[in-house]
Amino acid sequence: MSEDHFDEEHEGHGGGGGSRHPMAARFRGYLPVVVDVETGGFNSATDALLEIAAVTIGMDERGFVFPEHTYFFRVEPFVGANIEAAALEFTGIKLDHPLRMAVSEETAMNDIFRGVRKALKANGCKRAVLVGHNASFDLGFVNAAVARMDMKRNPFHPFSSFDTATLAGLAYGQTVLAKACQAAGIDFDGREAHSARYDTEKTAELFCGIVNRWKEMGGWEDFDD
């Protein structure tokens, strides 16, 4: 299904008639929401979702975007989930840590989706579009969790995304998150990396920096369509 066909089938989700909110005008009715997941492996169908964070994006009166609200959850592995030892070693996640305080996938996804829907309404947008560093990975795990729970109200577009690895490669010649942030003048602490919350907040800073830099260079105008 093409994106245009998907849009036609889902018109009416979000702001109605009248003048559009500047955010809706900027991204054709879509609200960027930055997401990062930490997982038990690479296979979204079989491997556990262990952490998820989301940052909604706001826009100021001058049309510059900024990270707005952060949502973060440590997640209990779903029943039968695969967890690779190498994945835990890479992320540093300790499943038996007494302060981990994980919640179910259902609780995590419902709370994040509730916050995203609130942001959609506030910005007059019809749907969220996932922003991620190597976004297809994060979107795959979000979609897999939605499918496992048979969730009917997923605010995210099922296949469109903004990938900051690609955007940073264009803007700064860097595709690794830490190096891209450094090139953009964003502090990045490697000791905090691979926490979903930290990576999401840094990805949000990077995305906003690239979008705002493009605006400052005169690369986008509010064209009516």
Curated annotation (Swiss-Prot):
One GO cellular component term noted in the UniProt record for this chain: cytosol
Keyword tags: Exonuclease, Hydrolase, Magnesium, Metal-binding, Nuclease, tRNA processing
GO term, biological process aspect, one: DNA replication proofreading
Residues at which Mg(2+) 2 binds: 36, 38, 194, 199
Cofactor note: Binds two Mg(2+) per subunit. The active form of the enzyme binds two Mg(2+) ions in its active site. The first Mg(2+) forms only one salt bridge with the protein.
Residue numbers annotated as active site: 194 (proton donor/acceptor)
Cofactor: Mg(2+)
Entries under CDD domains matching the protein: RNaseT
All copies of domain Exonuclease, residue ranges: 33-207
Keyword field contains Magnesium: yes
One example GO MF annotation: magnesium ion binding
Family: Belongs to the RNase T family.
PANTHER family: DNA POLYMERASE III SUBUNIT EPSILON, RIBONUCLEASE T
Protein purpose: Trims short 3' overhangs of a variety of RNA species, leaving a one or two nucleotide 3' overhang. Responsible for the end-turnover of tRNA: specifically removes the terminal AMP residue from uncharged tRNA (tRNA-C-C-A). Also appears to be involved in tRNA biosynthesis.
Name of the protein in its database record: Ribonuclease T
Gene this protein is translated from: rnt
